[in-house]
């Protein structure tokens, strides 16, 4: 019985494109019409050539032969913010270039295309050095970067080679009242009505190779771009997502699940709630603060809400309990295998050893390390030490003034008061820094100590500072209190608890054993921000309320939520006018028996962070949407995928086209797209 608990579920999996041939039969049974070579090939143009890593944390896709690129609004949010000001508030009002000359360059923004991936397990086992393999791959082309990534906790190794382009320009973005409609209120929620897209263009040198920004650069010509389907989706239609999911932990044991559900997530949720409340209150008072903290707030809130859904999902599915049952069945089998007989016992011991240290690192990272003044003081002391080690004098005043340019003392002090207090309440008393305990006792509480520190520190004032000022500053003394904790936390700065070496060493044999034992399970490697294929179908769902949730949302839902007095739901007047006249033009559809415009849809694709911006394609390989989210309780799919409730949320490509046309007035962009 327990052996079936984690047998691969329908639509579960994040498959390596180079090995997708093993899944084609199943994909075709669901409606896929293309071949494995159409998805991934190094010998001819394939769909992989139309997909990019966007900005280091998202996915994007080419829409034209002239480098036009589509991703999520939230993926480009920080870049749009960097181009915005009170006078040119592109976050609030959107931006639409009317010509190539109006496309706005974004310093530091890059996109990377996968050139190839290949397994190098045997080469490494034969004695080749990883650095030599990587160096040889990088030398094969201009702008190439390469890495060797571990699959199945090191049982297999794959080389990934990318080409990175550094001239990326903003072409168009809807106002946040469309691109972030629903804001954090609707984040991870269904039904959803967010026009979460932005449009960019990649530029290259004369040879179509990567080049630094130049007015002489030409639009990049991709080997492949997506045809855009305007026919839409119906429930049951095949869907495929091609992107770069960031992090899953499908094979961790029950100890890891329990830590996330009962300790880690609840602590992080509580601390982030307080930071968000402080920032939100300040944003409500000032347009300048609202813009300055827009991306920061979104970054904090995104994981904050995700973790809440993750806890709900893990508890509802009883994931830890099921893992324990699965482990018991595994252990019965393992007793006849000397190499595996004591494996789980050793893993449990390793978790017991590591969890206190890892929790300390997470607590520190979510509290003290979020204080801007602390981070500045610590980095300033480190920079001075480096300079003195080289026989130089560090320019502390220049660093001081650079820090103050974007520093909000009021917000940071409010955050510091709460975070120091929370740290003191949550830290193991035996790990409480003695000097911190003394200071808090002297001032009569954590918040009073913080107020005194901020009041006396010269690092936060406008007057010039010197090296002697730094050495005796109250903030510097505060930073030094945490020196040991900071150093130790860096030793535990792993992607997940289970990646700590003391634990991870056991996962390589554990994964090998699982694949030997559980032969009915379709294994796929955990996501690690490498290119993957996920597939499923358009589908609604029924949850605990016993109400069926349809898989398509419409413009009617936007208008039902519209409220000029609520920031998250205040849509542009032009959209109200279009709706009032039902003037949808070519984008009108009959949906649920009435004339409307589709906005978002649900599907059963297995996704994770990093899949934001991923193309959603139909069985013919045509673009039908842009992935941007999961439903709230689906976030536990990073640890367990359940097809009954796990749904990814995508913005319908027809809504994207509708906004480009009717709101942006940029229908000229259609001339370079392939619409079908």
Sequence positions of predicted segments:
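Bacterial N-terminal signal peptides
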Residues: 1-4
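Terminal presequence/propeptide segments associated with secretion/organelle targeting
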Residues: 6-676
């Amino acid at each position: 019985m327990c052996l079936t608990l984690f047998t691969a579920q329908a639509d579960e999996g994040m498959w390596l494109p180079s090995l997708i041939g093993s899944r084609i039969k199943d994909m075709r049974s669901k409606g896929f019409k293309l071949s494995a070579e159409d998805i991934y090939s190094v010998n001819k143009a394939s769909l992989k050539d139309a997909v990019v890593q966007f900005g280091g944390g998202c996915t994007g896709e080419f829409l034209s032969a002239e480098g036009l690129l589509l991703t999520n609004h939230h993926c480009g949010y920080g870049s749009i913010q960097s181009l915005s000001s009170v006078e040119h508030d592109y976050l609030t009002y959107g931006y639409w270039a009317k010509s190539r000359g109006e496309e706005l360059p974004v310093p530091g923004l890059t996109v990377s295309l996968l050139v190839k991936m290949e397994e190098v397990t045997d080469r490494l086992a034969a004695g080749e050095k990883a650095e030599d393999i990587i160096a040889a791959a990088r030398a094969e082309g201009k702008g190439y970067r390469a890495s060797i990534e571990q699959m199945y906790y090191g049982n297999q190794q794959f080389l990934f080679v990318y080409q990175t382009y550094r001239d990326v320009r903003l072409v168009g973005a809807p106002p946040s009242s469309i691109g972030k409609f629903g804001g954090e209120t609707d984040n991870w929620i269904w039904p959803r009505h967010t026009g979460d897209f932005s449009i960019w263009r990649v530029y290259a040198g004369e040879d179509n190779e990567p080049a630094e920004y130049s007015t002489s650069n030409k639009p990049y010509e991709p080997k492949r771009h997506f045809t855009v389907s305007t026919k839409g989706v119906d429930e049951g239609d095949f869907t495929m997502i091609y992107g770069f999911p960031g992090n899953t932990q499908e094979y961790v044991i029950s100890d890891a699940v329990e830590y996330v559900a009962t300790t880690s997530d609840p602590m992080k949720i509580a601390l982030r709630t307080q930071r968000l409340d402080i920032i939100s209150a300040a944003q409500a008072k000032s347009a300048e603060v609202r813009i300055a903290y827009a991306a920061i707030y979104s970054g904090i809130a995104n994981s904050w809400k995700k973790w809440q859904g993750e806890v709900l999902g893990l508890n509802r599915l009883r994931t830890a309990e099921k893992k324990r049952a699965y482990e018991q069945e595994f252990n019965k089998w393992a007793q006849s295998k000397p190499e595996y007989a004591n494996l789980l016992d050793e893993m449990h011991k390793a978790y017991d050893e590591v969890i206190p240290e890892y929790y300390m690192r997470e607590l520190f990272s979510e509290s003290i390390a979020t204080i801007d003044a602390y981070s500045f003081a610590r980095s300033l002391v480190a920079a001075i030490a480096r300079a003195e080690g080289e026989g130089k004098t560090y320019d502390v005043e220049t660093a001081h003034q650079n820090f103050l340019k974007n520093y909000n003392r009021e917000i940071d002090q409010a955050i510091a008061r709460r975070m120091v207090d929370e740290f003191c309440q949550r830290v193991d008393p035996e790990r409480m820094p003695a000097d911190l305990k003394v200071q808090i006792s002297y001032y009569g509480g954590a918040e009073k100590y913080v107020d005194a520190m901020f009041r006396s520190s010269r690092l936060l004032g406008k007057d010039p500072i010197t090296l002697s000022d730094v050495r005796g500053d109250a903030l510097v003394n505060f930073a030094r209190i945490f020196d040991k904790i900071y150093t130790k936390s860096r030793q535990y700065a792993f992607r997940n608890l289970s990646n700590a070496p003391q634990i991870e060493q056991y996962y390589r044999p554990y994964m090998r054993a699982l694949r030997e034992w559980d032969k009915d399970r379709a294994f796929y490697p955990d996501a690690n921000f490498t290119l993957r294929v996920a597939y499923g179908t358009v589908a609604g769902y029924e949850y605990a309320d016993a109400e069926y949730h349809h898989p398509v949302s419409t413009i009617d839902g936007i208008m039902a939520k519209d409220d000029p007095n609520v920031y998250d739901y205040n849509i542009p007047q032009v959209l109200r006018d279009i709706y009032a006249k039902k003037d949808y033009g070519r984008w009108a559809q009959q949906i649920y028996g009435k004339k409307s415009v589709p906005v978002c849809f649900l599907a059963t694709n297995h996704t994770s962070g990093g899949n934001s911006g991923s193309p959603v394609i139909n069985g013919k390989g045509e673009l039908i949407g842009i992935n941007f989210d999961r439903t709230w309780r689906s976030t536990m799919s990073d640890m367990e995928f359940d097809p009954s409730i796990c749904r990814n949320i995508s913005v319908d490509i027809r809504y994207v086209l509708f906004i480009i046309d009717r709101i942006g007035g940029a229908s000229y962009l259609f001339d370079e797209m392939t619409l079908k």
